[in-house]
Regions:
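Conserved GNAT acetyl-CoA-binding A-motif
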Residues: 89-101
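A short beta-loop-alpha structural element at the N-terminal edge
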Residues: 1-13
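A conserved beta-turn-beta hairpin within the catalytic core of GNAT-like acetyltransferases
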Residues: 57-65, 75
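Conserved acetyl-CoA pyrophosphate-binding loop and the N-cap/start of the following alpha-helix
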Residues: 74-83
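Conserved beta-hairpin
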Residues: 39-53
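A short helix-loop-beta-strand connector motif used in the catalytic cores of GNAT acetyltransferases and
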Residues: 31-42, 60
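Helix-loop element at the rim of GNAT/NAT acetyltransferase active sites that forms part
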Residues: 16-27
Length: 121
């Protein structure tokens, strides 16, 4: 298992993972733009990208996770937790925030459900 910053050659893998999740608005072009405007880290297993997280941060106060996803065939193996642990190690003094429906996963990692957040379509 290896975690690193995403590079241009990862765009196709990120696209395929997003498509697996049914995220039809994620095009190759959009992912290319996201690689410029936000930060993406990937997790590799046997030289295959099996998951990624995209986030925004000011590196001082807040880190906001916009996506965290692992391929369906690689779930329940600790890879999502490894991505979170990587963020915690890289940004030890910032607060991590996110919106998610996977409450049990994040609660196991000691995230608190603060019940706030709003979204415009």
């Amino acid at each position: 298992m290896f975690i690193r910053n995403a590079i241009d050659t990862d765009i196709q893998s990120i696209y395929e993972i997003a498509q697996q999740e049914g995220w039809k608005t994620f095009s190759i072009e959009k992912i290319q733009q996201l690689l410029i405007t936000s930060r993406i880290i990937v997790i590799e297993v046997n030289n295959e990208v099996v998951g990624y997280t995209r986030f925004l941060t000011d590196e001082t106060v807040t880190l906001y996770i916009t996506e965290l996803v692992v391929t369906k065939t690689h779930r329940k193996k600790g890879y999502a937790k490894a991505l979170i642990d990587y963020l915690l190690a890289q940004f030890p003094s910032v607060r991590i925030e996110l919106l998610s429906e996977n409450n049990s996963f994040y609660e196991k990692l000691h995230f608190r459900n603060i019940g706030t957040g709003y979204r415009l379509p």
